[in-house]
């Protein structure tokens, strides 16, 4: 028994060390100017590097078009479970996005996260710069996916951190934050991880697969938080707060922090503006879920627009597999009649490839497709 326990401890230590090494090596993003400070300068026009559209074609669908709404309490109640599970299945197959109400995350935990996040972005630049991204890292204060000095930039600043597992936290980031902010991240991250696993379990049931086959990929996985700050812009129609893309990870849970809207979802060739419901989360499926379900569910492009007069804040929680896990179609979706549509590679390989490229629609997922 003693030898077995020592072996388990050694394996656990080796896994942690491997995860730490691989998470440090997955990517980098170049340092860029701080947009919040640019906006404070009362610019008459946008600097050229931020101009993405001179004549923007941005077809929005009628205001009555909205992403579906799913009720978590209805999923948990036996009398409404079947109907709500069917609604969830339709939302995932037809939209890849939905709002989740009655989700069970404590209101106080959500409000504390909003407050601490706002206070962080209100800090003087020199204080925020203590948490800036280093030249060889994707985490910290700055912009992600900046891979060249010629690349167009988003009209936004962000603060990205790995929140779970705690042993992957960079010592100069979350541990150095003010205690109230650390506590907010701890409580918020823990409750969102629990919520995400529940959602994935229900998705598995809707798909007719073993729920464990789905949740096992994510239960010990990596949760990352990205806090987004979109300053007011003098020419909002010419820039992107976040350029069109699909999320590369597993499941994304977004919380709107203030009342300013900006998220848009691609649907039927146009863009659907999302009007967040009070206290709801916005859930979207990432590329990894499209791969795992062999295309039964799919990720969807979305973008963030900015406001001419007001700032917008949001925080996204991303749930991904462990770095040593394989990412590929689950066995439930492969048969002689239905071959694999995507390659199988390790999560470490997957994310290294992702972070070496600029965000561009679903182009990275396309690289994972098996060409027949």
Swiss-Prot record:
GO BP, sorted A to Z: coumarin biosynthetic process; response to molecule of fungal origin
Free-text comment on the cofactor: Binds 1 Fe(2+) ion per subunit.
Keyword Metal-binding: yes
Amino-acid positions noted as binding Fe cation in the UniProt annotation, renumbered to this chain: 245, 247, 302
Subunit structure: Monomer.
Subcellular location: Cytoplasm
Practical applications according to UniProt: Nevadensin is a selective inhibitor of human carboxylesterase 1 (hCE-1), a key enzyme responsible for the hydrolysis of a wide range of endogenous and xenobiotic esters.
Organism domain of life: Eukaryota
Organism of origin: Ocimum basilicum
Cofactors named for this entry: Fe(2+); L-ascorbate
Catalysed reactions listed for this entry: gardenin B + 2-oxoglutarate + O2 = nevadensin + formaldehyde + succinate + CO2 + H(+); 8-hydroxysalvigenin + 2-oxoglutarate + O2 = pilosin + formaldehyde + succinate + CO2
Xref: InterPro entries: DIOX_N (IPR026992), IPNS-like_FE2OG_OXY (IPR044861), IPNS-like_sf (IPR027443), Oxoglu/Fe-dep_dioxygenase_dom (IPR005123), Plant_2OG-oxidoreductases (IPR050295)
Family assignment from sequence similarity: Belongs to the iron/ascorbate-dependent oxidoreductase family.
Keywords, in A-Z order: Cytoplasm, Dioxygenase, Iron, Metal-binding, Oxidoreductase
Pfam families associated with the record: 2OG-FeII_Oxy, DIOX_N
Activity control, per UniProt: Inhibited by prohexadione-calcium, a 2-oxoglutarate-dependent dioxygenase (2-ODD) inhibitor, thus leading to a decreased abundance of nevadensin (NEV) and absence of pilosin (PIL) production, but to the accumulation of gardenin B (GARD B) and 8-hydroxysalvigenin (8-OH-SALV).
GO cellular component: cytoplasm
GO terms assigned for molecular function: 2-oxoglutarate-dependent dioxygenase activity; metal ion binding
UniProt-recorded name of the protein: Oxoglutarate-dependent flavonoid 7-O-demethylase 1
Ion transport as UniProt keyword: no
Pathway: Flavonoid metabolism
Amino acids binding 2-oxoglutarate: 312
Enzyme class name: oxidoreductase
Listed EC numbers: 1.14.13.-
Cystine pairings recorded for this chain: none
All residue ranges annotated as the Fe2OG dioxygenase domain in the record: 221-321
Predominant place of localization: cytoplasm
